[in-house]
Amino acid sequence: MCERSLYRAGYVGSLLNLQSPDSFYFSNLRANGSQLAALPPISYPRSALPWATTPASCTPAQPATASAFGGFSQPYLTGSGPIGLQSPGAKDGPEDQVKFYTPDAPTASEERSRTRPPFAPESSLVHSALKGTKYDYAGVGRTAPGSATLLQGAPCASSFKEDTKGPLNLNMAVQVAGVASCLRSSLPDGLPWGAAPGRARKKRKPYTKQQIAELENEFLVNEFINRQKRKELSNRLNLSDQQVKIWFQNRRMKKKRVVQREQALALY
C-alpha cells in the first residue's frame, strides 16, 4: 500500500517553492511560467532530496508525450481549437490527454451547433413522387409526367384543358374521332421509347376493266399458269408479277365457292 506522507514531493515542493525537473533547463522560470525572484536556482538534482524519492508503485503512469511538455499543456491561444497528440489506441482521459492549439481548427461547440441536412436516398424520393400520382383519381388537373407531355404537345390540348376545368358531365357525348386523332398525333411525339411506325403500306390500285377482261380470258383457257405466262401477262397489262399471281389465286377460290354453293342448292 502507498501511504500519503508529508515528505512526498507534492507536499514539500509546494511549501518550499521547489522547481520541476524542466526548470533546470530554464533556471528563472517556475512550472507555471512565472519568474522566481527571491530564491536562487538550485544546483543539485531533485533526486538527491530524501523526501523527493517516491516508490515506483505510488508513481502514476504517464504517457511518453506528457513528459515532452513537462506534464502541463501549452497556453491557450485566442480563436484556436485543440488537437490531441495521443495515439488512437491510448485511453481517453482528461489527465492523460495532451493538446496543443492551432488558430485554424474550429472548436467542438461550433461543430456540434452546425446542423447537417438529412440524407434521403434516391429510391425514397422516387417512391414519394410516385405515391402522390399513383391513386390520384380525384385531381383531374394533376397528371403524371408522361401524360403532361402528351397534353402540352397535342394540338387539341388547350381545348381539352378548358373542358376539364369545369364540372364533368357524364351524360355528355364525346367525339371519339376527334379524341382519337389527337391521341394518335401526340403518341409518337410524347413517347420516344415507343416502336417506330412501320413501312407505309401501298395504296391498293383496283384493276381496270381491260385488265380484268384479259385476265378472265386467260383464266378460262387455263386456271393455273406457269411463271413464263405470268410474266408475259404482267408486261402486257402493266401489272406486277405478284398482282397477276394473287388475282389468279382469288379467282380460283371464287370459282370453288360458286361450285360449293351450287352443290348445296342441288341437295335441297
From Swiss-Prot:
Region (Disordered): 102-124
Location(s), subcellular: Nucleus
Gene3D superfamilies on file: Homeodomain-like
Domain of life according to the entry: Eukaryota
Gene Ontology annotations for the cellular component aspect, listed alphabetically: nucleus; transcription regulator complex
Keyword flag Nucleus: yes
Stored Pfam families: Homeodomain
DNA-binding region extent: 200-259
DNA-binding among keywords: yes
SUPFAM superfamilies given in the database record: Homeodomain-like
GO process annotations (BP): embryonic digit morphogenesis; pattern specification process; skeletal system development
UniProt record similarity statement: Belongs to the Abd-B homeobox family.
Biological function: Sequence-specific transcription factor which is part of a developmental regulatory system that provides cells with specific positional identities on the anterior-posterior axis.
Annotated protein name in UniProt: Homeobox protein Hox-D12
Organism taxonomic ancestry: Eukaryota, Metazoa, Chordata, Craniata, Vertebrata
Gene for this chain: Hoxd12
